[in-house]
């Protein structure tokens, strides 16, 4: 595999054109696309193996992949042990989509191969599966709502009159009427707060925008490990909060939140996405 550390992948992929490659007679024109695809795959593989490029989601997914290999090799108990550990980590970091996939493989193994241990475990797996399914449904609804409102804001700007404001508010209320706010976990809360920020901006409610941008940012300070796993969301939340405080000319609160952000930069991962912000 290609050894890549902190090399800019964009430079590797785009600095050498097809004409230059063909001129050097490295390959034929017919084989060029295959060569590029192979190079691209090797670069991605090397980046994945680089510890500095890994995040929690990738590590959990890797454990899930290993457990799948063990299952396919007939090592069912070993696979279950790894799945339980990966699922626990996924739930700790609110990676519920991966946790649900892990749980589905757990159910397959338990029901097909470990029949003597299924007593009592079946109810536990079913209950956990139903709970995760509900949480994923809520997360999907809230992320869809957030995306839709953000799209409206980018495409149309602020609501032009009272009729538009009422229409947007009615849409928001309809989409959130069945959401149980008390049961929301980190990601669902984040989507809910983001959706409220976009709603507040669309309706030009600066007070509400400040309230929910603060909730957005506070969510990360309550769970500081999420700053490391979701740095872009953390920085964007701070960006909106500071912009709103600037518009409100609240210099005291602006300095308070700015100083907290400065202190948090020491734990932010140094990735291209973070540096681009």
Language-model segments: what does each one mean?
Residues 94-101, 137-144, 180-191, 223-236, ...:
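Alpha-solenoid helical repeat architecture
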Residues 1-75, 111:
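Intrinsically disordered, low-complexity protein-interaction/activation regions
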Residues 84-92, 126-134, 169-181, 213-226, ...:
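Amphipathic alpha-helical segments of tetratricopeptide repeats
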Residues 63-72, 104-113, 144-161, 190-205, ...:
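Tandem amphipathic alpha-helical repeat scaffolds
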Residues 108-145:
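Flexible loop and strand-edge segments within Gram-negative outer membrane beta-barrel domains
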Residues 86-115, 225-229:
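Short, charge-rich amphipathic alpha-helical segments embedded
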